[in-house]
Regions:
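Catalytic domains that recognize anionic headgroups
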Residues: 1-533
Length: 533
């Protein structure tokens, strides 16, 4: 009976996680989040059962040695922890997906009260403890056990869903997350590596960089590449900027349709699904070359599944779980008892996948075009500047942006060394840029600059500076010129880029973004807290 009661209460305690894993997902969540893997389901089911078992053993030992006061305190905490399911109301679960107005109303009403629920638990425990000390404890234990038995049928619901998902586990690992390397022919033509670092800000990285921040790899690259001091992105949000960059035309998001986006061309004002729009990968494959993509945020693999020889997409944030069993257990326990660090851990995991698991694979497989979309230096802050390594426990202050920039610099260094080790550094065209600048830079120094880095290293490794304004929207056409062997040297690249700058800002960008609402923010239909990137 003891195990059943505690099993029921622990199961209820983890209701927010059950809802997160099994709740009906919105179109937006489906688009932004990879399908959970089997490990996540095993992790949650095992965590609830093992924690219940451990608590039961603990309680049995307390009763065995007749520690009445400890038993009372134990039941106080167990009873008070039932406040946690209130947090369920903050989650966009099935019932709220059917009634969006209720979802937004509940979130707006509870966000100021529910968030510090752990503090509320402590207050309730303190008050209850005082009352119980003055009265008998038998009634407390009786009521808690009665409530546990009343809620026990929910175990059947949660674990019934769990076993149902595991039974149909074949659909959990799909092309939504990964497209495995195909049998590709050896490509001996031009090779382009395109790196996008999310929210990298030109002004703060180069013009106004703090004196104590050293970025040796970026500074070194600046001396052997084409360097633009006035490059502007096509949009100010990842959800629109990346489709614009990959298609070579400015787009705004109309809506999210499960695994795809409906986009509007801001020049022709026509609407199309992202998968149907011409993109750099399709054009490169039409030239007979090969393509690879590894990136976070967007639902790349289903969108470009016929245009890529290799694809690995990574979670956009809070809805995701770690791919390993123990990693998922850590995420679940951390969120329940300490802090919700899923976003930080997702970012760290993303970098691990890109830099240590996918980098060698994409380079060694000799792809003609490799596209990498890194989550840093976008928040959350995940780099410990003192210890020089990633950590999910970094102080949330604007100054920590530069910690993430140190991580960017390390990644560029690792990328260079990998290319050099494979004999590709002096044979490849390397493009480093960003989808947008740091939107919250005003929190750091009260300034906002829309410029992003735009660095192009040609095979000959010559340094040149372009000071004329240019839109990074030209990147797609530039890559095609390289793949066609019409551009192969730094001089040819500079000449082509300067020619493109003559049309700026026609069809490339509007400065500032506020001149056009659709270029300022994603569609109002989207939840801004989850859609922005």
């Amino acid at each position: 009976m003891t195990l059943l009661c505690l099993f029921s209460l622990v199961n209820i305690f983890f209701i927010p996680e059950w809802a997160n894993l099994f709740g009906e997902q919105s179109e937006q969540q489906i688009f932004l989040t990879p399908t959970p893997r089997v490990n996540a389901y095993f992790a949650l089911g095992s965590t609830v059962f093992i924690l219940s078992l451990l608590l039961s053993v603990f309680l049995i030992q307390i009763r065995r040695y007749q520690f009445k006061k400890i038993e009372t305190i134990f039941y106080l905490f167990i009873g008070a922890s039932l406040i946690v399911p209130i947090n369920f109301l903050r989650e966009f679960t099935a019932i709220f997906n059917y009634y969006p107005q209720l979802s937004y109303a509940a979130h707006g009403l509870l966000k100021h009260f529910v968030f510090p629920y752990k503090v509320i638990i402590l207050i309730v425990v303190a008050i209850a403890f005082i009352k119980v000390v003055r009265s008998q404890t038998t009634s407390l234990i009786k009521y808690v056990n009665a409530l546990a038995l009343l809620l026990a049928p929910i175990i059947v619901v949660t674990y019934g869903n769990l076993f149902s998902k595991l039974y149909s586990a074949a659909h959990l690992v799909s092309l939504q997350n990964v497209i495995s390397p195909s049998q590709i022919k050896n490509w001996d033509g031009p090779k382009v590596r395109w790196l996008i670092f999310d929210e990298m800000d030109y002004r703060l990285v180069f013009d106004d960089r703090p004196k104590g921040i050293k970025l040796p790899e970026l500074d070194r690259l600046q001396k052997e590449a084409i360097f633009s001091s006035a490059a502007y992105p096509p949009n100010d949000y990842t959800i629109e900027a990346v489709p614009s960059l990959l298609s070579g035309a400015r787009k705004s998001v109309i809506t999210i349709k499960s695994e795809d986006l409906v986009l509007r061309n801001l020049i022709t004002h026509t609407d199309e699904k992202w998968a149907d729009i011409s993109n750099i990968f399709r054009d490169v494959k039409d030239l007979g070359s090969t393509t690879a993509l590894v990136g976070w945020y967007h639902n790349y693999c289903p969108v470009f599944k016929t245009d890529l020889d290799y694809c690995r997409r990574l979670p956009a944030g809070r809805f995701g779980y770690d791919e390993s069993f123990f990693g998922s257990v850590l995420v679940i326990l951390e969120r329940a008892f300490i802090l919700d660090k899923r976003l930080e851990r997702a970012f760290i995991f993303n970098l691990e996948v890109i830099t240590r698991r996918s980098l060698d694979r994409t380079i060694s497989n000799n792809y003609g075009l490799s596209f990498f979309h890194f989550s840093v230096p976008h928040s959350p802050w995940i780099f410990d500047q003192i210890k020089g390594k990633t950590s999910p426990y970094i102080l949330r202050s604007p100054e920590q942006y530069f910690g993430n920039m140190l991580l960017v610099d390390k990644i560029i260094g690792e990328f260079r060394r990998t290319l050099e080790a494979n004999g590709e550094w002096n044979k490849s065209t390397l493009i480093i840029s960003s989808d947008h600048s740091w939107r919250k830079s005003a929190e750091y120094d009260s300034k906002r600059d829309f410029r992003v880095p735009f660095i192009i290293k040609m095979a000959d490794g010559k340094a040149r500076v372009i000071n004329k304004p240019i839109g990074t929207i030209v990147t797609k056409n530039f890559i095609l010129e390289v793949m066609k062997k019409k551009i192969s040297t730094t001089d040819e690249a500079v000449s082509w880029l300067q020619e493109q700058s003559k049309d700026f800002p026609k069809g490339t960008i509007l400065i500032p973004f506020k001149d056009e609402e659709t270029a300022t923010s994603p569609s109002k239909k989207l939840d801004s807290k989850k859609a922005k990137g």
